[in-house]
Amino acid sequence: REQVRGGAGALESLAGRVAIIELLGLSHAELCQRAALSTPFLPTIHWITAARSTAQTRWLLMEIFQRIWLGSYPRVNEYGGEIRDIFYRSYIQTYIQRDVQDVLKVTDQLAFHRFLVAVAARTAQLLNYANLAQDVGIDNKTAKAWLSVLEASGLIFLLQPYHSNLTKRLVKTPKLYFLDTGLAAYLTKWNSAASLE
């Protein structure tokens, strides 16, 4: 329960007056300024056909790599590559020095940075705690704790597998996704959109 000071020093609860809205980076439709025209993705032939017919332009492969390299943060897309490295460097420093330090009490910030890089390098792959921990030089328990903080803070998403059998769904391995492609590219040292090619 959060409390703030009222007028005469009284404490007032914010319960019932606050909503938490999770915002991800800008979508492709938002970056193209077509968000009002877009509908949520559905994996159907009808949706794909309709989306293709309303697409304004075909993208060149290098334009797609540029979009991946920049990521989905509004400021980076507004100014482009000229501020990208400064933005992501500052973002990582702030994230590690403030948020992570407060939550995890990480004593080895270099190890945590290596962990971030290792996670970014594994985007869209099956999650393997043992390999991740071994590559960074930490134990599995620490890798799980650190990964849960990355997930809770909106840096990554764990896509749980689908299976018609609920038991199999619970024991199968999830895939790990970095939510911002620009941050993943920055951490893995892709220095330009052309380097993604």
Predicted features, each with a name:
Residues A8-A121, Q125:
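Interdomain motor-coupling "hinge/lid" segment immediately C-terminal to the ATP-binding subdomain
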